[in-house]
């Protein structure tokens, strides 16, 4: 670890030095001196020097409005560079071992050493691997795409500099390129001027595919194949690709009026266009490479006399022509032109697969396996992973929108008001209509705009090429009728196949009722016939934690999954659990390996489907090497969870979790819902109101424009508390509950749970991570600078609670200090703190100046507003997550 960390520190220091030179060139020595003074004071403050801490506060408070932005940008950009270096070191030879693809080899060796597992069982588990990653446009990716691209280039420079054989003149060239990139970043505005549209967000997703996943996925499969061959003597079949990508960008309309049916239609076309573009590049390479003459009779028959001299090239050129014709047609459609479909339009993956696989088989049969297993194999695997759609799209809509649409229809037909019917009456009506052969929608009927939008969305699904829409997710699902309603609306749109419809259970009550809802659905004969033995259910992490606090929410999530697994197993249904996790702890985020092994036994039998959100997409899939690492971690965790499932918790442990859940929920809600001072305190102690000015995502921060904390989305709720370093949503209630159980004489039982139950140990580990990022003196400083004195007691109470929570968690985990088991992460947080602290202090000062200007009725100072936005972005970089 020391060697790894010293290499990271060395690179961070080098990048910081280059940034300093850039600042000096751009703004002069005096600004660099000011930044250096602040950095040294921050470092000394972190080491416990109280006098230097006070001097740091005074220095930052006394900055002139002209100095605010350069200082904020200096520390913010440094943190982005530190994150780039850290990402590189997680995949470099000197980097963290646990992030290396070697993790698969270690898992396979561990499995082979189990007396009750043989190679055939492990092979079967590999063959049933299924991983679907759902990229979402949650507005937590605060870094602009142009800067992300430059960071990727900086990463390449670090890789070249790491080469011990690099010649001096080459090193000089790389350093010059590094200086150019850092100067480009400095002279680029890090804050977007406008909110991205849903189409912009979709394009960002396609850029991730092009720049990283396109190469990362075949590389991961080569690595997996190599490890399987070495450890099991087993080769992956050519058509076996266990990973798929889906996107919510352009499909998630829950609370986002900007995502319309037309937008979804446009994004589907755009996605197909991007797929043709990427496959064309692959085929250009194959046309160049596959110049061989020898071919099987089958391939020669396929190409005929015309292609006999260069059969492989001939087939590739024909495929290239089809791709070009398809791309031209898609371009015309995107421009709004109505053109007839050309002959050979590519709409299905088989059209791509067949000519490529014919070449592969012929090369293998003619003794040219080494060529077949080169670029051609990579392209075949891309066809299986990405295919014609590139990424499939999920449609997500809130349950009440479907209820309102059906209410409007039934009122128009004069058969009553669907919205006011009982659940039993709704189900009876829906099942009757689902079995009916006549249409429900009246002709020449003019629905309201909202209802038209719901119906148009269903029409888009019906028109889309089969396989381009992955699932229909119903947010805030509460009852069986919520699921049946969507099936009816899809039937009315003319969808002739069983579209996967996934209810999303996301509040505490809904999670507790999830099993009952699914049991009722599975008891309906029509429904059982429709789903053909497969069911997807989405578990909401963000909103349940916001509703009840992390401890109660995580236990409700565990119990809901456990009950659903057992119900579906009993009914002979293959269940896919879809995890709606965020990147932050308060939204269910946890290291992938730990998170998966902490789920109930059997939860991964139907594969893993999980959201990858916002800034986590960049951290986990921003580079091809990082993609290989992340997919390897998921693979090893799924194999381990399925072959060495965690133990069923003892009844006594379940009872303790029930107790912890009740106490933590009461404590959490006691503050968040019932304390009259809480909302005013939240609004003043955090930049919650100012976050709305940041042009992050296309989705509004609130589900409804008015209302308090309950109407705020989970992301800005977490984002705000992360900024002031209290991190409140990620721990409030948990420590109080643990302390109460300890006082009841159950500490030894809690220690046993921590040792022997992955679910509980992961919860404590996540709390330790949060505590490491929280900071009492900074949270206190926000109060002193921004909060009315009448609210100070509440702030002190919360900070005292946090301090007590840290003590009780350390006692149960038997740790002397936080993150004792993860020194790399602990060191990383400490490294960034020196640069994040000044941004926090500066942010509090800027919030004070901005709010004072507003109170005085003056126009906002653009220098203050811009610097404030930069501190928000900088703190997000320092915390490594936003919402």
Curated annotation (Swiss-Prot):
Reaction it catalyzes:
oxaloacetate + phosphate = phosphoenolpyruvate + hydrogencarbonate
- Gene3D superfamilies, alphabetically? Phosphoenolpyruvate/pyruvate domain
Which residue positions are annotated as catalytic? 138, 546
Name one cellular component (GO) term. cytosol
Q: What is its EC number?
A: 4.1.1.31
What UniProt keywords apply to this chain's record, in alphabetical order? Carbon dioxide fixation, Lyase, Magnesium
Record-level GO BP terms: carbon fixation; oxaloacetate metabolic process; tricarboxylic acid cycle
Q: InterPro entries given for it?
A: PEP_COase, PEP_COase_bac/pln-type, PEP_COase_Lys_AS, PEPCASE_His_AS, Pyrv/PenolPyrv_kinase-like_dom
* GO molecular function annotation: magnesium ion binding; phosphoenolpyruvate carboxylase activity
The Swiss-Prot or TrEMBL record lists the needed cofactor(s) as: Mg(2+)
Report the enzyme's class at the first EC level: lyase
Entry function: Forms oxaloacetate, a four-carbon dicarboxylic acid source for the tricarboxylic acid cycle.
What protein family is recorded? Belongs to the PEPCase type 1 family.
Protein name, per record: Phosphoenolpyruvate carboxylase
Organism source for this protein? Salmonella schwarzengrund (strain CVM19633)
């Amino acid at each position: 670890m020391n060697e790894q960390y010293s290499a990271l520190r060395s690179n961070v220091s080098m990048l910081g030095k280059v940034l300093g030179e850039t600042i000096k060139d751009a703004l002069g020595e005096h600004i660099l001196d000011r930044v250096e003074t602040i950095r040294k004071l921050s470092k000394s403050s972190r080491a416990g020097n109280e006098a230097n801490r006070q001097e740091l506060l005074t220095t930052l408070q006394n900055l002139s409005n002209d100095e605010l932005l350069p200082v904020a940008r200096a520390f913010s950009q440094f943190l982005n560079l530190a994150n780039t270096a850290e990402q590189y070191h997680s995949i470099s030879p000197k980097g963290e071992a646990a992030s290396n693809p070697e993790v698969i080899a270690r898992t396979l060796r561990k499995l082979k050493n189990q007396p009750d597992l043989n190679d055939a069982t492990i092979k079967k588990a590999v063959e049933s691997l299924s991983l679907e990653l759902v990229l979402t446009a949650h507005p937590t990716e605060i870094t602009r795409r142009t800067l992300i691209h430059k960071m990727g280039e900086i990463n390449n420079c670090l890789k070249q500099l790491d080469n011990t054989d690099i010649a001096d003149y080459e090193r000089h060239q790389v350093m010059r390129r590094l200086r150019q990139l850092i100067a480009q970043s400095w002279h680029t505005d890090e804050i977007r001027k406008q909110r991205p549209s849903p189409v912009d967000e979709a394009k960002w997703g396609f850029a991730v595919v092009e720049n990283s996943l396109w190469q990362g996925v075949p590389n991961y499969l080569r690595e997996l194949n190599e490890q399987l061959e070495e450890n099991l003597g087993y080769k992956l079949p050519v058509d076996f690709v266990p990973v798929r990508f889906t996107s919510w960008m352009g499909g998630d309309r829950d609370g986002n009026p900007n995502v319309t049916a037309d937008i979804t239609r446009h994004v589907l076309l755009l996605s197909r266009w991007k797929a043709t573009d990427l496959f064309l590049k692959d085929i250009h390479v194959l046309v160049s490479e596959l110049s061989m003459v020898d071919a099987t009779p089958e391939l020669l028959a396929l190409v005929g006399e015309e292609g006999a001299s260069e059969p492989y090239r001939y087939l590739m050129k024909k495929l290239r022509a089809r791709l070009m014709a398809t791309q031209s047609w898609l371009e015309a459609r995107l421009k709004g032109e109505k053109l007839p479909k050309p002959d050979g339009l590519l709409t299905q993956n088989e059209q791509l697969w067949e000519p490529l696989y014919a070449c592969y088989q012929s090369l293998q049969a003619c003794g040219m396996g080494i060529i077949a297993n080169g670029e051609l194999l990579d392209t075949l695997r891309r066809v299986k992973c990405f295919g014609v759609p590139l990424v499939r799209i999920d449609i997500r809509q809130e349950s009440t929108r479907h209820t309102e649409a059906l209410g409007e229809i039934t009122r128009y037909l004069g058969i009553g008001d669907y919205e006011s019917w009982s659940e039993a009456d709704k189900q009876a009506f829906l099942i009757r209509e689902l079995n009916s052969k006549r249409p429900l929608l009246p002709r020449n009927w003019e629905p309201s705009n909202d209802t038209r939008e719901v119906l148009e969305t269903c029409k888009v699904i019906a028109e889309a090429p089969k396989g381009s829409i992955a699932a229909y997710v119903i947010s805030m699902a509460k009852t069986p009728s919520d699921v049946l309603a969507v099936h009816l609306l899809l039937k009315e749109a003319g969808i002739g196949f069983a579209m996967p419809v996934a209810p999303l259970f996301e509040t505490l009550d809904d999670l507790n009722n999830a099993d009952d809802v699914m049991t009722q659905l599975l008891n309906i004969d029509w429904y059982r016939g429709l789903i053909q033995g497969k069911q997807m259910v989405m578990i909401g992490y963000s909103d349940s934690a916001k509703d009840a606090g992390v401890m109660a929410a995580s236990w409700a999530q565990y119990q809901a999954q456990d009950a659903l697994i057992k119900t579906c197993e009993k009914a002979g249904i293959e269940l896919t659990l879809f995890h709606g996790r965020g990147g932050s702890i308060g939204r269910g985020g946890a290291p992938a390996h730990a998170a998966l092994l902490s789920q109930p036994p059997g939860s991964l039998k139907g594969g893993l489907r999980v959201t990858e959100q916002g800034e986590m997409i960049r951290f986990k899939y921003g580079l091809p090497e990082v993609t290989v690492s992340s997919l390897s971690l998921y693979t090893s965790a799924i194999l381990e969870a399925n072959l060495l499932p965690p133990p069923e918790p003892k009844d006594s442990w379940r009872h303790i979790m029930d107790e912890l859940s009740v106490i933590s929920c009461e404590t959490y809600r006691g503050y968040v819902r019932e304390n009259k001072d809480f909302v005013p305190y939240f609004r003043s102690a955090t930049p919650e109101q100012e976050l709305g000015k940041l042009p992050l995502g296309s989705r509004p921060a609130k589900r409804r424009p008015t209302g308090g904390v309950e109407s705020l989305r989970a992301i800005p709720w977490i984002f705000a508390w992360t900024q002031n370093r209290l991190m409140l949503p990620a721990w409030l209630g948990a420590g109080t509950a643990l302390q109460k159980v300890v006082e009841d004489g159950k500490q030894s039982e809690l220690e046993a749970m921590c040792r022997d139950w992955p679910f509980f140990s992961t919860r404590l580990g996540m709390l330790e991570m949060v505590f490491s990022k929280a900071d009492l003196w900074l949270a206190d400083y926000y109060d002193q600078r921004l909060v009315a004195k009448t609210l100070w007691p509440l702030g002190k109470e919360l900070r005292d609670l946090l301090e007590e929570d840290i003590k009780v968690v350390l006692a149960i985990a038997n740790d002397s200090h936080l993150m004792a088991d993860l020194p790399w992460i602990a060191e990383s947080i400490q490294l960034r703190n020196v640069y994040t602290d000044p941004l926090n202090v500066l942010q509090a000062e800027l919030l004070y100046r901005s709010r004072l200007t507003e109170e005085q009725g003056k126009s906002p100072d653009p220098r203050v507003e811009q610097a404030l936005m930069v501190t928000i972005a900088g703190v997000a970089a320092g915390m490594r997550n936003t919402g």
